[in-house]
């Protein structure tokens, strides 16, 4: 049974790493230059702090998901990894939420603040960001499954009640 748990943990963590890396790479490659009424306008992820936070959080999540594969199951480190998984999940949720809020403002603007939507001028950039956000939500969902599975394994080791 321990081999099945290790295999399942590895598959889930590899899926989480792949989804997180995909989200980060897609966001990093989001860029578009366009001309609007004769004014050159460039949009890049690095111009928005929320998008930078998104990239850093998801890159860290991808690296962490790969590094934690080396942690032996049932060890004290596996309990620490579970705690870190929960914290990382909160960071990922914050990153995708903040990037999503900025993306929504770019798409719809904010009439109360007088901010106009910009996605009408930079379609490809906004679509690229949307793809990164979708990958981010997928990564967050997979990470949640990792946390639930790890919680099950750690509590089963502490109290094998069945």
From Swiss-Prot:
Assembly description: Homodimer and heterodimers.
Tissue-level expression: Mainly expressed in roots and leaf sheaths. Detected in shoot apical meristem, organ primordia, including branch root primordia, and vascular tissues.
Induction of synthesis: By brassinolide (BL) and auxin (IAA), synergistically.
Family: Belongs to the Casparian strip membrane proteins (CASP) family.
Any single Gene Ontology cellular-component annotation: plasma membrane
Membrane topology: Multi-pass membrane protein
Entry-linked InterPro entries: CASP/CASPL (IPR006459), CASP_dom (IPR006702), CASPL (IPR044173)
Signal peptide positions (record): none
Protein name per Swiss-Prot or TrEMBL: CASP-like protein BLE3
TM segment ranges: 8-28, 51-71, 86-106, 129-149
Annotated Pfam families: CASP_dom
Species in which this protein is naturally found: Oryza sativa subsp. japonica (Rice)
Subcellular localization: Cell membrane
Keywords, alphabetical: Cell membrane, Developmental protein, Membrane, Transmembrane, Transmembrane helix
Keyword Transmembrane included in the entry's annotation: yes
Role this protein plays: Involved in cell elongation in rice through dual regulation by brassinolide and auxin.
Residue intervals annotated with topology Extracellular: 29-50, 107-128
GO BP annotations, alphabetical order: multicellular organism growth; response to auxin; response to brassinosteroid; unidimensional cell growth
Ranges in the topological domain labelled Cytoplasmic: 1-7, 72-85, 150-162
Main localization of the protein described in the UniProt heading: membrane
């Amino acid at each position: 049974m321990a081999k099945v748990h290790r295999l399942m943990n590895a598959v889930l963590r590899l899926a989480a790493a792949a989804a997180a890396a995909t989200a980060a790479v897609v966001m990093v490659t989001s860029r578009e230059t366009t001309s609007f009424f004769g004014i050159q306008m460039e949009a890049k992820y690095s111009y928005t702090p929320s998008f930078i936070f998104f990239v850093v959080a998801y890159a860290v999540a991808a690296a962490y998901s790969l590094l934690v594969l080396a942690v032996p199951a049932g060890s004290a480190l596996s309990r620490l990894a579970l705690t870190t998984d929960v914290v990382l999940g909160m960071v990922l949720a914050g990153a995708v939420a903040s990037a999503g809020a900025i993306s929504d403002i770019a798409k719809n603007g904010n009439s109360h603040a007088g901010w106009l939507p910009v996605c009408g001028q930079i379609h490809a950039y906004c679509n690229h960001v949307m793809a990164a956000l979708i990958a981010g939500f997928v990564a967050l969902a997979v990470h949640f499954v990792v946390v639930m599975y790890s919680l099950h394994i750690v509590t089963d080791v502490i109290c094998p009640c069945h």
